[in-house]
């Protein structure tokens, strides 16, 4: 197991496309918060107090005498402490206390200038390597999915492909794929990038983040195709990527709550066809004459990170998995009076947690897939993430028993940088046989 830690006071890079341009003040806000835990890695042992220095600059100048409101609470949970502090020459220290159990504490700050609120927050961890998920694994979890995959394989690989000139370069070709995922006609779309040159290449499957939307920025990871890897970037709802924005708006209205659809029955849950459809894309990749016959990877972030893990577990041909802050992890966590993962089922409405819904989520929780991974895994996550909180990312990482490494980027919220994404590519290259 390998863990890399990076702590920083300021975000010093503004990112655009594939280039990185330095700016003195990338946030472009009147106010800049700087919060610096007294442990450089933002990590503490349970029972150990955390002291955080708070700095606030307006137009780059330290503000003096300003009263800052603060609250403190566990990761994604209501505050259990509140107060105010007064900045002296733009600075103050606050002891946020400790935790008796492993987890994260969140210091939430707010300053007001001329009627405008300037919020900020910072999370620090307490023995997070000891975090354990709340979600239970069904006794027949592996049998459920083995049966589902076996049934799915009875349906032959069926897809169409058409060239896409606007995403084709001198080093790679691009095709739009429509992959049929069920005998009844359901489908998923994807862009397939294949290096030019006539060789045999590793293949990488990249599922999408959450939402009902088009395939985002297909060329943002062009260095895969241009660097000698076959790559698929897909969507999961069967929506043509050239559908109009009005069309996507209509679809979002119709199925924006897809992560709740069919939740009373694991065989009827919306995500069953998605999980199986993602695995089916591996059949497509491995059927290509350009595939090298031995290297197959999954890679994604958020919901895509979740699907990278589930797909890798469902197909033992995968020899490497990369996941940024995976969603769909410890989804019933809030029922245990702790942090739960995206999409935060039952956080505000625990009364809706019927035994049927809980049972279904157990079959689809990424934690339970991660327990059974047998390929090398690279993960990355930030501590300040309020979409896929660090608590659940640690829980996923902690249950993985295969070779694993983590890049910890404490200041990150729900994003990664271009260098981090490029690092995934380099890691995949290093794992090729």
List where the protein language model places each region.
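Proline/serine/threonine-rich low-complexity linkers at boundaries of modular beta-sandwich domains
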Residues: 23-33
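N-terminal cap/lid segment of alpha/beta-hydrolase-fold proteins
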Residues: 38-42, 152-197
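Short beta-strand element of the alpha/beta-hydrolase
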Residues: 190-192, 200-210
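Cap/lid segment of the alpha/beta-hydrolase catalytic domain
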Residues: 210-276, 333-340
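Gly/Ser-rich "nucleophile elbow"/oxyanion-hole loop immediately N-terminal to the catalytic nucleophile
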Residues: 257-302
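Hydrolase active-site cap/lid region
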Residues: 305-353, 408, 416-419
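Short beta-strand/loop motif that positions the catalytic acidic residue
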Residues: 373, 379-381
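C-terminal catalytic histidine-bearing segment of alpha/beta-hydrolase fold enzymes
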Residues: 387, 394-433
């Amino acid at each position: 197991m390998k863990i890399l830690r990076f702590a920083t006071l300021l975000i010093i890079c503004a990112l655009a496309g594939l280039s990185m341009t330095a700016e003195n003040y990338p946030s472009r806000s009147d106010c800049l918060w700087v919060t610096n835990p007294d442990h450089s890695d933002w990590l503490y042992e349970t029972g150990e107090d955390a002291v955080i220095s708070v700095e606030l600059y307006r137009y780059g100048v330290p503000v003096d005498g300003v009263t800052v409101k603060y609250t403190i609470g566990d990761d994604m949970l209501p505050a259990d402490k509140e107060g105010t502090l007064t900045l002296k020459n733009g600075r103050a220290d606050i002891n946020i206390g400790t935790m008796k159990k492993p987890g994260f504490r969140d210091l939430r700050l707010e300053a007001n200038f001329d009627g405008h609120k300037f919020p900020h927050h910072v999370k620090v961890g307490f023995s997070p390597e000891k975090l354990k998920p709340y979600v239970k694994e069904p006794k027949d979890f592996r049998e459920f999915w083995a049966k589902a995959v076996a049934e799915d394989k009875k349906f032959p690989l069926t897809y169409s492909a058409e060239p896409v000139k606007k995403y084709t370069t001198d080093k790679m070709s691009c095709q739009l794929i429509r992959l049929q995922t069920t005998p009844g006609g359901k489908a998923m779309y994807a862009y397939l990038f294949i290096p030019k040159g006539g060789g045999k290449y590793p293949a990488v499957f990249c599922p999408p983040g959450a939402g009902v939307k088009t395939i985002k920025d297909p060329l943002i990871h062009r260095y895969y195709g241009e660097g000698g890897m076959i790559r698929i970037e897909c969507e999961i709802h069967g929506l043509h990527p050239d559908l109009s924005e009005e069309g996507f708006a209509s679809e979002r209205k119709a199925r924006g709550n897809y992560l709740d659809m069919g939740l009373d029955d694991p065989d009827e849950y919306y995500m069953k066809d998605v999980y199986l459809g993602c695995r089916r894309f591996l059949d497509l990749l491995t059927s290509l004459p350009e595939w090298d016959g031995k290297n197959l990877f999954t890679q994604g972030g958020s919901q895509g990170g979740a699907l990278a893990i589930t797909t890798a577990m469902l197909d033992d041909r995968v020899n490497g998995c990369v996941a940024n802050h995976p969603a769909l992890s410890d989804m019933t966590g809030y029922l245990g009076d702790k942090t739960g993962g995206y999409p935060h089922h039952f956080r505000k409405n625990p009364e809706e947690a019927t035994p049927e819904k809980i049972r279904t989520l157990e079959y689809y929780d990424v934690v339970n897939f991660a327990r059974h991974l047998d390929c090398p895994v690279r993960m990355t996550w930030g501590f300040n993430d309020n979409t896929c909180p660090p608590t659940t990312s640690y829980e996923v990482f902690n249950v993985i028993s295969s070779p694993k490494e983590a890049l910890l980027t404490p200041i990150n919220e729900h994003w990664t940088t271009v260098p981090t994404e490029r690092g995934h590519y380099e890691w995949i290259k290093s794992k090729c046989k």
